[in-house]
UniProtKB/Swiss-Prot annotation:
It catalyses: L-glutamyl-tRNA(Gln) + L-glutamine + ATP + H2O = L-glutaminyl-tRNA(Gln) + L-glutamate + ADP + phosphate + H(+). Allows the formation of correctly charged Gln-tRNA(Gln) through the transamidation of misacylated Glu-tRNA(Gln) in organisms which lack glutaminyl-tRNA synthetase. The reaction takes place in the presence of glutamine and ATP through an activated gamma-phospho-Glu-tRNA(Gln). One of its GO terms (biological process) is translation. The keyword Ligase applies. It is an enzyme of class 6 (ligase). Belongs to the amidase family. GatA subfamily. PROSITE patterns: AMIDASES. GO terms for cellular component: glutamyl-tRNA(Gln) amidotransferase complex. It comes from Synechococcus sp. (strain CC9902). This is Glutamyl-tRNA(Gln) amidotransferase subunit A.
Length: 491
């Protein structure tokens, strides 16, 4: 399979022309999945029977001349923290190992209404807390470009699924970079929409004011198509914005001549920024300039305060959200408890992994009496200042540009005993979540060792259309993936 022929529009045309059936397309991807899965450990659940049944149903509908949705017959994967009715949703945690949701998340429901076919639920860091997909209770996922390296996290399974060709596209969630960082590490496109652009109904909550659902794809155009399907108001989610959804594909081919691209100074001065990443991202900026965009250096003085701010706010919200897992109504329950109190404490101690427990403790401490003003409230104040820095920057530019991650994918186990080093992998993505802005990671190069590098483009609130336009124009001009190194598990 050539990645240039693996786009949604290309497959849709082949399906409409009768060059391939939905069943044949699904079987191709299942075969690819079954070949790669023993090496990659991408999936927590593989839904072969459901996928084939859905494909057969769509083929019958097509033969009967029925109207079909824009994703009809296309195999998709879903991060295993989005509820799928009748299919296990585990959050890669022992706590929810056997949980089968009785309802469907809004985002996935819209995919199925558009004709998408579920091939499986993808691995993640437990409860989406991590940056490497190593904290999963079911084992780590590996990077398709180099099995000794991580795929990023927390949506590492969704990124690796697209990169390895076991699905055409996938969904992930992004709380502090969990779509964009894995997209960078795995050499795919990852889009985090504006907070509230996509419903969070049915997304198992980590940090409710930061979480957002978004797509992984092999191209910017595919990401635009997926966003078109999943975006829009939802009365079941009070934080979902009640605003019209524009046509995200309409402006992709428009010139970016005259647009102003802000290069955030603090990001290129960041401690620990890899030299190859710096060079690749600066080359991406130069490519945009060659396309007619104007590069403007801008300052976001509090950008690098994002990490400290996030690691007060996100654990605080996690502490509250995960309080529901007590072994009483559903989820893991410890055996042989002598009382309700010991049953609850034992269930949480045995059901949650080390990283989840660490973040719950941090959050509980930050919210405790005597510390809430010094930590949580102060962090919220800094969050406001970070947002104001972005507001000021967008007064003079149309989009912002940074590296997606400070380095290419690191080796598995490299940060096992140093959680702070792991947290710093999201240094360049976290501020975007704190401000609720849309951002996209697009491949922009490779390291000397053959690992992908991503450039992050950041848009203003609800300006995904322009963000996608700039990203698409860059992608088409740079054509980075045509010069990619060979990797046995990347088609």
């Amino acid at each position: 399979m050539d990645r240039k022929t693996m786009t949604i529009s290309a497959w849709r045309q082949q399906l409409q022309n009768g060059d391939i059936s939905s069943r044949e397309l699904v079987d191709q991807h299942i075969e690819r999945l079954e070949t790669a899965e023993p090496s990659l450990s991408v999936y927590n659940e593989i839904t072969v029977e459901r996928a084939r049944a859905d494909a057969d149903r769509i083929d019958a509908a097509r033969a009967a001349g029925e109207s079909l949705g824009p994703l009809a017959g296309l195999p998709l994967a879903i991060k295993d923290n989005l509820c799928t009715r009748g299919v296990r949703t585990t959050c890669s945690s022992r706590m929810l190992e056997h949980f089968v949701p009785p309802y469907e998340s809004t985002a996935t429901e819209r995919l199925w209404q558009a004709g998408g076919v579920l091939v499986g639920k993808t691995n993640l860091d437990e409860f989406a807390m991590g940056g490497s997909t190593e904290t999963s209770a079911f084992g780590a996922t590996h990077n398709p470009w180099n099995l000794d390296h991580v795929p990023g996290g927390s949506s590492g399974g969704s990124a690796a699924a697209v990169a390895s060709g076991s699905c055409i596209a996938s969904l992930g969630s992004d709380t502090g970079g969990s779509i964009r960082q894995p997209a960078s590490f795995c050499g795919v496109v990852g889009l985090k929409p504006t907070y509230g652009r996509v419903s969070r109904w049915g997304l198992v909550a980590f940090a409710s004011s930061l979480d957002q659902v978004g797509p992984f794809a092999t191209s910017v155009a595919d990401a635009a198509e997926l966003l078109q399907v999943i975006a829009g108001p939802d009365p079941r989610d009070s934080t979902c914005l009640n605003v019209e959804v524009p046509d995200y594909s309409a402006g992709l081919n428009q010139s970016i001549k005259g647009l102003k691209v802000g290069v955030i100074k603090e990001c290129f001065d960041a401690k620990g920024l890899d030299g190859e990443v710096n060079a690749s991202v600066r080359a991406a900026a130069a490519q945009l300039e060659a396309l007619g965009a104007e590069l403007v250096e801008v300052s976001c003085p509090r950008f690098n305060d994002g990490i400290a701010t996030y690691y007060v706010i996100a654990p605080s919200e996690a502490s509250a959200n995960l309080a529901r897992y007590d072994g009483v109504k559903y989820g893991f329950r410890a055996a042989d408890a002598e009382s309700l109190a010991t049953m609850t404490s034992s269930s949480r101690a045995e059901g949650f992994g080390e990283e989840v427990q660490r973040r719950i403790l941090i959050g509980t401490y930050a919210l405790s009496a005597g510390y809430v003003d010094a930590y949580y409230k102060k962090a919220q104040q800094v969050r406001t200042l970070i947002r104001r820095d972005f507001d000021a920057a967008f007064q003079s530019v149309d989009v912002l540009l940074t590296p997606t991650a400070p380095s290419p994918a690191f080796k598995a186990g490299a940060h096992k005993d140093d959680p702070l080093a792991m947290y710093l992998a999201d240094l360049l993505t976290i501020p975007v979540n704190l401000a609720g802005l849309p951002a996209i990671s697009v491949p922009c190069g490779f390291s000397q060792t053959g690992l992908p590098i991503g450039v992050q483009l950041i848009g203003n609130v609800l300006d995904e259309a322009r963000l996608l336009q700039v990203a698409h124009q860059y992608e088409q001009a740079a054509d980075v993936l045509s010069q990619r190194p060979k990797a046995p598990l990347v088609p």
